[in-house]
Amino acid sequence: MLDLTFETPKPKTIAGAKHDWELVIGMEVHAQVASQAKLFSGASTAFGAEPNSNVSFVDAAMPGMLPVINEFCVEQAVRTGLGLKAEINLKSAFDRKNYFYPDLPQGYQISQLYHPIVGEGEVLVEMGDGTARRVRIERIHMEQDAGKSIHDMDPNMSFVDLNRTGVCLMEIVSRPDIRGPEEAAAYIAKLRQILRYLGTCDGNMQNGNLRADVNVSICRPGAYEKYQETQDFSHLGTRCEIKNMNSMRFIQAAIEYEARRQIAIVEAGGEVDQETRLYDPDKNETRSMRSKEEAHDYRYFPDPDLLPLEIEQAWVDDIAASLPELPDDKKARFIKEFGLTDYDASVLTAEVESARYFEEVAQGRNGKLAANWVINELFGRLKKEDHDITDSPVSPSQLGGIIDLIASDAISGKIAKDLFEIVYTEGGDPAEIVEARGMKQVTDTGAIEAALDEIIAANPAQVEKAKVNPKLAGWFVGQVMKATGGKANPGVVNQMVSKKLNG
C-alpha cells in the first residue's frame, strides 16, 4: 500500500475587494459504463454510429416494452465502488426521475435516488507538492443517459439522436471536500485513472464518456472548518452548479470565473442565487441556464417496472478478488521494487497501458535505466508526435533489447539513441541492427590509445592548457569519440585521457 504520509493542501484563497474568500467545491461525475450493451436493453453502445441506429424498442419507449437490467453494468458499478473503497449496498432500487425533453422518449429517466448501489468511499488526490486531499465519495448510483439534441444542422429544425439513450451511467457524487480549481482537475484526473485501471469506464472526455457537474460556493476563512465540525451547510455560501464539463482545463477556468462572480455579488451586498449554469469557453464565463432544481421538482417515485435489485455478498467478494492492482498500490510497488523516484513512478503509473509497458521493459533489467528510457526517450518522442503508448512503434521487447546492449557495454549511450531512432522509424531487432551496421562499441584499448596519441601529438598547445585546467580534458574525450564515430567506450576514453595528461 502507498504510504499516506501527506499533508493536507491549503485551500485556495481569492482576494476580493473587501475580504479574502475560500472556495468549496463538490463534484458529480457522470462516467459511462464500459459495456457493449445498454443498461436496460441489448442495443449497442458503440460511439460514432449512424444517428438512431443503436436504438431498441425499449430505448425508444415503444408501448409495452419493459426494461431488463444488464447484469454486467451492475458488476461494473460494484467494481467501481470497490475500487473507490466504498460500501456496496446489497439491496438497491430504481426510481423514475420525471421531466420532459425531446431526447428523453420515456418522459422520465430511470435512476437511483433513494437506494443507490454504492455508498460512501474516498479518493486520495495527490497534488504533486507533497500534499494530498482526501475527497470523500457520498454515493454512486446507476442511471440511464439521455439522447442528444442537435440544433446546428438546419436553421428551422432541431434533430434528435437516440443512440446514447439508455446507455448506463455511474453518477459518482463527492462531498464538498475540494478546495480549489487545481484540486478539482486533479480529482477528475485521479478518478479517471482509477476507472481506467478498473476497466469500468474509458474516461474519454472528448466523446462525453466522462462529464462533470461542478458545484461551486464561496465562504470566509474559518467557515469551512465550522461546517466540518457541525456538517451544517449554513456555514457555507449558496452553491451554483456548472453543468456538463468535459475538459479539465475548462473545469479550472469555470471555477475561477464562477468564484469571482459570486464574490463580486456578495461584496456588493447581493445574494447568490442557487442555479444551474453553463460555461462558455469562448467567452470564459458562466451564464445562467435555469434555477437549481430540488428532488421534489422531478417527482421521483419507485419504478414499478423494476423490482428492487438484490445482490449476494459472495458475488461482491468474487468481484473484489478479481480487482487489478490499482494506481496507488502500483506506484508504491514500482518505488520499492525498481528503486524509482516518486515522480518517475507517478509518470509511469498515470495510465494503465504505460505501467504495463514499463513493467515488461524493466523485467529482469535495471529499473532506473528502464524508467529513464521509457520516460525520456519513448514518451518524449510519442508526445512530440501526439501519440500515446498504445501507438508505440517500439515494442517492450525492442526497447528492452536496446537496454541490454547498453548494459553489456556493446553500445554507448550515444549509439543507443541512434539505435532507438532506427528501431522507432524502421523497426527490427536491435542486436541484429547493431551487428549489421557496425554500431558496436569500440572497447579495444589499443585502437582507442592510438587515436588518442594521434590527437595529442597534433595538439600540443591544447595539452598544456589541459594540464593547467583539468576541465579541458573533455575536449580530448570529444575528439576521440569523433575519431571513432562515437563508438569508443566513454569510460575507457575518460580513464585513458586522464592517464595520458597527468602521466
Swiss-Prot record:
The keyword Transport does not apply. Keywords: ATP-binding, Ligase, Nucleotide-binding, Protein biosynthesis. It is an enzyme of class 6 (ligase). Its EC number is 6.3.5.-. Belongs to the GatB/GatE family. GatB subfamily. HAMAP family: GatB. This is Aspartyl/glutamyl-tRNA(Asn/Gln) amidotransferase subunit B.
